[in-house]
């Protein structure tokens, strides 16, 4: 029996695949399945059965679809393809991983560049990769390994040392964890200079003359002049060293030393509140530096361990909106946050507003439909009231957008069509089983127009009274909302409103609920009908 046949008939394999199909969001089950397949297929080489290789590839790919932030698995997958001789496929896997991180994964870049060092012989093509990596991860606090690789390739592939000097000089200005190593390289390079002309490789002639008073065309005794020039260079280097050292110590002591998780964590893993707080402070600090590339990078770093927490997604999108006016970028961040975060309420709310500002009503509709379908088309049963109310508001907005017909059902009964109104009624019928019922009633009073007061009164307030739902009838806010519905009806005169509330609404209140209802009604009366305070008091204090 071949390995593939033996594997698919293996009882353990069946159990592992069943666990993955039942719990696709469990990283532990995916890892167990992948490890089992790889172990059963060992040694994996070009002669391994094609069916086994296909199974391994499918498992890797499916796992990375579910968990796109697994840096190490992109690397393992890519290097496996390299081992099998599929260089182009390795490139694609690395690039797929980098795309998942918006090109901002230091681990993926260093692994990819090591791979590129071995397979790309064309110098320009290779250095283009390094330049792209520099753009995205060059400012990373722990990017020392990347810069080491870059300098190493420049040394081995470039005949001129000017590029080396340029890159090294750039590194000196970055607060890196391993900054002292690069300063040592710089000072060693200065010591190795044997001719004044070589100083032009450090910087331009004009800058040397203007800032350091060093003339590389000096015609006097060049030996002593060169030594003096080196002293000036070392002096300014040490001054720069002190500045960068202070920055590094500050960043490390306040932030980096308190961050222990620098990798993706599954939804089951809890990150300590102290570490989360450190990340938030670190991001605030980064934003104040006003270096966009570093801000993007540190947000991406924070999302690695905190992908399932909504606060980083929200903070990132708000920075894009408020500081960069980048609504499109904020939308993409929030859509990713919706996929990862366990708490979605605030993300959805912010995403709704961003989509509306972008006038992407089709996307808004699709999002609302997905949210509704995720609750089996019973969004009114969601425990979180904010999700329900936001859904209601934006569904209404979407129906009344330019894409809706002016004769559509959304206009027939005011602002909510029959479908949405039914959802409101179902939510209210849950009474104390659902949160936010008072807020819902209060919002409905404000939500409807003057033309629909009668409809709301008949189908909400009178219906609840008719059904005798004590949860509402003993709640002063219910009666307060009912009174305000009538009071804010602009089609009635002040006298009509007053008489209707005093003669029609108040008498419907059971006096056994007087103690719980009276405070809220008193508040209403003091605000709108102070002259009826005595009437209210008499109505609820007289003996039955």
Curated annotation (Swiss-Prot):
Motif (Nuclear localization signal): 230-235
Keyword line: mRNA processing, mRNA splicing, Nucleus, Repeat, Ribonucleoprotein, RNA-binding, Spliceosome
Keyword flag Nucleus: yes
GO biological process per UniProt: mRNA 5'-splice site recognition; mRNA splicing, via spliceosome
Signal sequence interval, chain numbering: none
Domain of life: Eukaryota
Annotated HAT repeat ranges: 7-39, 51-83, 85-118, 121-156, 163-195, 255-288, 290-322, 366-397, 456-488
GO molecular function: RNA binding
A Gene Ontology term for the protein's cellular component: nucleus
SUPFAM superfamilies per record: TPR-like
Subcellular location: Nucleus
Oligomeric form and interacting partners: Component of the 18S U1 snRNP particle, a subcomplex of the spliceosome.
Note: Present with 1730 molecules/cell in log phase SD medium.
Function comment: Essential component of the U1 snRNP particle, which recognizes and binds the 5'-splice site of pre-mRNA. Together with other non-snRNP factors, U1 snRNP forms the spliceosomal commitment complex, that targets pre-mRNA to the splicing pathway. U1 snRNP is cotranscriptionally recruited to intron-containing genes. Required for U1 snRNP biogenesis.
PANTHER family, per database record: PRE-MRNA PROCESSING PROTEIN PRP39-RELATED, U1 SMALL NUCLEAR RIBONUCLEOPROTEIN COMPONENT PRP42
Protein name (Swiss-Prot/TrEMBL): U1 small nuclear ribonucleoprotein component PRP42
